[in-house]
């Protein structure tokens, strides 16, 4: 299924039903009083998060949504039926912005969470309510109010504990495949990953969510490649894994590659740049010898002082230990 993470839609809540003007007319009751009922409230429109949905694609093809109008009141003090509310099902992690003001209306971050977007119109009042000692047969009533209208922008930011960052072909997709049940496409050409992928990593009785986004290239912060559009999906991650290919097939310099990604991340967002970050040195199986020494030299050249992990995602070497360390880190963050 195609991944869609931003759409604009129009929302119209239901109109309230009109109040009714009616009088009691029965045999042997020649002067029956007013019995006009109230109308029904108009239907409202809500957002509802569903963990089984992972894209906004349904809203790419249908852009206008109308909640049901309330029914008018009737005689014998019968109230009109309220308009049915409408629920728009979206992925967990969806935010809503008012298109006119660009202000954030809210977000749904938990499965089943509900957020009201537009309110239905209030019901009209029937003539029963206007009876008084001086007016025994009122013909006054009120109309139902119009429902609220808004144009909104839905934005999906994936909810992941760990996000993978790196150049195209750094081995991010292979890594997420090796530690979870996710099945992103893997091949030896840039931008194999066209859209973000989520994978659930299980460590004993624990589990956490890992996100793989398209590779970042130089100029991503200005819109080059695919990375810019999807860097926003790192914002809610608790930790970022910078995956570096220690033995690039194009014979580029891993040190320069590392700094290129770090530079783009900082240009895009200082907040993202300051997130906890681990270094993962991938494809160590392609190093002929002195693996540890070469990795240590690489770490020294980039001036990295934090924890780093040497793995071969393709051979699943070091990946289990990496998953355990990430799980320990997440527990400490709680």
From Swiss-Prot:
Its main location: cytoplasm. Its cofactor is Mg(2+). Belongs to the TRAFAC class OBG-HflX-like GTPase superfamily. OBG GTPase family. Mg(2+) binds at residues 173, 193. GO terms for molecular function: GTP binding; GTPase activity; magnesium ion binding. It is found in: Cytoplasm. It comes from the Bacteria. Residues 1-159 form the Obg domain. InterPro entries: G_OBG (IPR031167), GTP-bd (IPR006073), GTP-bd_Obg/CgtA (IPR014100), GTP1-OBG_CS (IPR006074), GTP1_OBG_dom (IPR006169), GTP1_OBG_dom_sf (IPR036726), OBG_GTPase (IPR045086), P-loop_NTPase (IPR027417). GTP binds at residues 166-173, 191-195, 212-215, 282-285, 312-314. Keywords: Cytoplasm, GTP-binding, Hydrolase, Magnesium, Metal-binding, Nucleotide-binding. Pfam families: GTP1_OBG (PF01018), MMR_HSR1 (PF01926). An essential GTPase which binds GTP, GDP and possibly (p)ppGpp with moderate affinity, with high nucleotide exchange rates and a fairly low GTP hydrolysis rate. Plays a role in control of the cell cycle, stress response, ribosome biogenesis and in those bacteria that undergo differentiation, in morphogenesis control. CDD domains: Obg (cd01898). GO terms for biological process: ribosome biogenesis. Its EC number is 3.6.5.-. This is GTPase Obg. The gene is obg.
């Amino acid at each position: 299924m195609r991944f869609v993470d931003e759409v604009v839609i129009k929302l119209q809540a239901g109109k309230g039903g009109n109040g009714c003007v009616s009088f009691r007319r029965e045999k042997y009751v020649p002067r029956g009083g007013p019995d006009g009922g109230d109308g029904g409230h108009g239907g409202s429109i809500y957002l509802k998060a569903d963990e089984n949905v992972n894209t906004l694609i349904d809203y790419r093809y249908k852009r206008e949504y109308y909640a049901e109008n309330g029914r008018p009141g009737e005689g014998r003090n019968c109230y009109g039926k309220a308009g049915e509310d409408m629920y728009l099902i979206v992925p967990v992690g969806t935010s809503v912005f008012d298109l006119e003001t660009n202000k954030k209306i809210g977000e749904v971050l938990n499965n089943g969470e509900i957020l009201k977007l537009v309110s239905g119109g209030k019901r009209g009042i029937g003539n029963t309510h206007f009876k008084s000692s001086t007016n025994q047969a009122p013909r006054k009533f009120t109309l139902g109010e119009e429902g609220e209208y808004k144009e909104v922008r839905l934005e999906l930011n994936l909810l992941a504990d760990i996000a993978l960052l790196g150049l195209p072909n750094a081995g991010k997709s292979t890594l997420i495949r090796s530690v979870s049940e996710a099945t992103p496409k893997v091949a030896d050409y840039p931008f194999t990953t066209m859209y973000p992928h989520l994978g659930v990593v299980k460590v004993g009785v624990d589990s956490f969510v890992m996100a793989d986004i398209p590779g970042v290239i130089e100029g991503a912060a200005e819109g080059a490649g695919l990375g810019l559009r999807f860097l926003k999906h790192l914002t809610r991650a608790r930790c970022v894994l910078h995956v570096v290919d220690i033995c690039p097939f194009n014979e580029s310099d891993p040190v320069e590659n590392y700094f290129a990604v770090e530079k783009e991340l900082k240009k895009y967002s200082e907040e993202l740049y300051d997130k906890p970050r681990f270094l993962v040195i991938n494809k160590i199986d392609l190093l002929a010898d002195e693996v540890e020494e070469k990795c240590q030299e690489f770490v020294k050249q980039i001036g990295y002082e934090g924890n780093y992990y040497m793995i071969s995602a393709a051979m699943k070497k070091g990946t289990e230990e990496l998953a355990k360390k990430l799980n320990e880190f997440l527990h400490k963050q709680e």
